[in-house]
Amino acid sequence: MNRDTSPDLQYLSGFGNEFASEALPGALPVGQNSPQKAPYGLYAELLSGTAFTMARSELRRTWLYRIRPSALHPRFERLARQPLNGPLGGVTPNRLRWNPQPLPTEPTDFIEGWLPMVANSAADKPAGVSVYIYCANRSMERVFFNADGELLIVPEQGRLRIATELGLLEVEPQEIAVVPRGMKFRVELPDGQARGYIAENHGAPLRLPDLGPIGSNGLANPRDFLAPVAHYEEAEGPVQLVQKFLGEHWACELQHSPLDVVAWHGSNVPYKYDLRRFNTLGTVSFDHPDPSIFTVLTSPTSVHGLANMDFVIFPPRWMVAENTFRPPWFHRNLMNEFMGLISGAYDAKAEGFLPGGASLHGVMSAHGPDAETCEKAIAADLAPHKIDNTMAFMFETSQVLRPSLQALECPQLQADYDSCWATLPSTFNPNRR
């Protein structure tokens, strides 16, 4: 394979833009999408990420101008080695927390290293989300695409170099990458090993949340999202193309690289975002605002304001609220919360929640700061204080998340999670207000 190893990649800035990029001058047709003879003898191909008749503001589609059309492939065969996508575990209302998953000892590439954690929908449904933790120690030689959903990738350890049909992305911990449904890609590991989280979004593509009375600026700013520039591989020789289809891996062997797009234009693109650029908002008077003010991306449902999935972060920020219990409050939620930790510590948990770990609080599961955090917060001097050197996140969804059998049976599941609240005392005194 002819692969670009340059450390300085170029990107296109913006979110939801109608981008255009070409690796050879004049490779993009002018004034039309599908000319009788495309420049350089290329094939025109459309990749649709939404239905043709969606509102124009919600359309996602990209025209590709490639050396060989995607239709040039033999029959897909079901692979003998299948992902750990077993049945979901039994129903449990219990709060769950996991220690970090170990890195593999055997050679494991990106798509072999997915551990299913929770899900609320089968892959053939038009909504829902499945969550995985990935652990890998070998760069991919094959190419992959996911027919089941859009992928939101959250590295916790190790950089990822993602070669996509539209170009190259490199992401490190505290950055994220999003790969559209059906987009072919290959993941290389510049640091030799990697671990992180994946949300597989089966619903509407992720978008920026509405800002409402916040105004026209704040949270994740559109210009900080970066899409790749056109980059193609012109290579002949056997390449395995793997697709995930209804939770199963199927593959065929090509005699060329499928990452052969010389030019493209459209809005259905992979992209990256640096979480450290998030414009964090919070109170400058009293009380702790709702965590929705930390939303980076959202996948909506047909009910206005109800998310199929929100991606929320808890970044470094100043705490200045007066006469206020400053940690996230005790809560019972209509939504379902899967949390992970990229670095540092989470301000509602003094211990037990580690980078690479995870927790699940289902619908109406009572949760909140642990006993140690609560005791310190009640007694704290309420001077301005910065929560620093941290990055936690949450996948929040309106449908109940059920843990997988693998997640329920793995040794990383903490048997004593409930004990972090067990020593919360009763301080009620009816004679003293």
Swiss-Prot record:
It catalyses: homogentisate + O2 = 4-maleylacetoacetate + H(+). Its EC number is 1.13.11.5. InterPro entries: HgmA_C, HgmA_N, Homogentis_dOase, Homogentis_dOase_bac, RmlC-like_jellyroll, RmlC_Cupin_sf. Homogentisate binds at residues 346, 367. It comes from the Bacteria. One of its GO terms (molecular function) is homogentisate 1,2-dioxygenase activity. The active site is at 288 (proton acceptor). Pfam families: HgmA_C, HgmA_N. Keywords: Dioxygenase, Iron, Metal-binding, Oxidoreductase, Phenylalanine catabolism, Tyrosine catabolism. It is an enzyme of class 1 (oxidoreductase). Its cofactor is Fe cation. Pathway: Amino-acid degradation; L-phenylalanine degradation; acetoacetate and fumarate from L-phenylalanine: step 4/6. One of its GO terms (cellular component) is cytoplasm. GO terms for biological process: L-phenylalanine catabolic process; tyrosine catabolic process. Fe cation binds at residues 331, 337, 367. Belongs to the homogentisate dioxygenase family. Hexamer; dimer of trimers. HAMAP family: Homogentis_dioxygen. Involved in the catabolism of homogentisate (2,5-dihydroxyphenylacetate or 2,5-OH-PhAc), a central intermediate in the degradation of phenylalanine and tyrosine. Catalyzes the oxidative ring cleavage of the aromatic ring of homogentisate to yield maleylacetoacetate. This is Homogentisate 1,2-dioxygenase. It comes from Pseudomonas putida (strain W619).
